[in-house]
């Protein structure tokens, strides 16, 4: 910081000397000195390049009020080495849509997650006795959810939350322990907002693409770590969305998945609903107003 200011002062001094040498009259010298002093004030108000901050960028665009993806390094928690390059565009698109209809989702049971949650097109029909809101973003990761939790979920004062997140962390070579820690931070933030708010945490589902065996082992580790934490909290519950889809090797049942062996088809969503129904009943989400 000191070196930066010294360099700045040197630049200003040199500018003044140059102005004095080039002036042909006292009036021009005086004008040049005045200009130099103004420039000095403006330059010293600017931050030096060595300054850094750990605070995340604003979640909204000042001009439109629509939230934009802040960049991987500006997310809280521990992020994977890389992410899907289309996430920023999907993030902006979804937030623009949600901003326009946010008032309609106040008091809803919020389904929070990534593209698997986002793709539940029959969500409202499948839970006719609940007011539900979908806050899934395709390609999202745990630290992305942690970043947008307040604006997308807690600001709605939800009646409950159904969380499914983590497969994109694993798919982008994230460490299961880091992903589990991010998930714990999400849940702790929810508890801090409202200690009585009930949350269903869905286990990360199996996937069968490249490195299937490696992914299966990592997802099992992640699910076990998250479940251990959830069991310590009376207002949190687990929905086992791993074993309802996976065989003994952790390979997803092709009947329930699209051809990418990652995203659910209509049959797969029906299986998820069946698994959720008794957990929702136990958590008494039915207190949410019917739509």
Q: Which residues does each PLM region occupy?
A:
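N-terminal secretory targeting modules
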Residues: 1-111, 117-126, 281-291
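Catalytic His-Asp segment of secreted/periplasmic serine-dependent ester chemistry enzymes
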Residues: 39, 206-291
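Acidic/histidine-rich helix-loop elements
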Residues: 73-86, 128-144, 171, 261
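Loop/turn elements at helix/coil->beta-strand transitions in domains of secreted/extracellular proteins
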Residues: 106-108, 130-131, 157-160, 194-198, ...
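Extracytoplasmic/secreted proteins, especially bacterial periplasmic and envelope-associated proteins
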Residues: 111, 140, 144, 148, ...
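Sec-exported extracytoplasmic/periplasmic mature domains
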Residues: 117, 150, 154, 166, ...
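Oxyanion-hole/transition-state-stabilizing segment in secreted/luminal serine hydrolases
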Residues: 117-133, 142-184, 189, 200, ...
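Charged, glycine-enriched surface loops/patches
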Residues: 180-202, 219-236
């Amino acid at each position: 910081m000191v070196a930066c200011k010294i360099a700045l002062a040197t630049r200003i001094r040199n500018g003044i000397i140059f102005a004095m040498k080039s002036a042909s009259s006292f009036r021009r010298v005086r004008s040049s000195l005045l200009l130099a002093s103004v420039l000095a004030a403006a330059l010293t108000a600017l931050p030096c390049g060595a300054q850094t901050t750990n605070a995340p960028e604003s979640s909204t665009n000042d001009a439109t009020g629509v939230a934009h993806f802040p960049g991987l390094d500006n997310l809280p928690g521990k992020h994977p080495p890389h992410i899907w390059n289309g996430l920023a565009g999907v993030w902006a698109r979804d937030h623009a849509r949600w901003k326009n209809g946010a008032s309609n989702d106040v008091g809803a049971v919020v389904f929070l997650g990534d593209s698997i949650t986002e793709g539940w097109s029959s969500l409202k029909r499948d839970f006719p006795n609940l007011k539900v809101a979908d806050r899934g973003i395709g390609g999202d990761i745990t630290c992305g959810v942690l970043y947008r939790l307040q604006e997308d979920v807690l600001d709605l004062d939800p009646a409950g939350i159904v969380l499914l997140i983590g497969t994109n962390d694993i798919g982008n070579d994230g460490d299961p322990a880091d992903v589990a820690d991010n998930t714990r931070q999400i849940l702790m933030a929810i508890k801090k907002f409202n200690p009585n708010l009930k949350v269903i945490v869905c286990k990360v589902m199996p996937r069968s693409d490249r490195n299937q065996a490696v992914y299966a082992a990592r997802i099992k580790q992640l699910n076990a770590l998250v479940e251990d934490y959830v069991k310590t909290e009376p207002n949190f519950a687990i929905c086992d969305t791993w074993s309802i889809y996976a065989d003994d090797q952790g390979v997803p049942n092709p009947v329930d998945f699209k051809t990418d062996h990652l995203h659910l088809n209509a049959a797969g969503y029906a299986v998820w609903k069946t698994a959720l129904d008794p957990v929702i009943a136990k958590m008494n989400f039915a207190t949410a107003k019917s739509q």
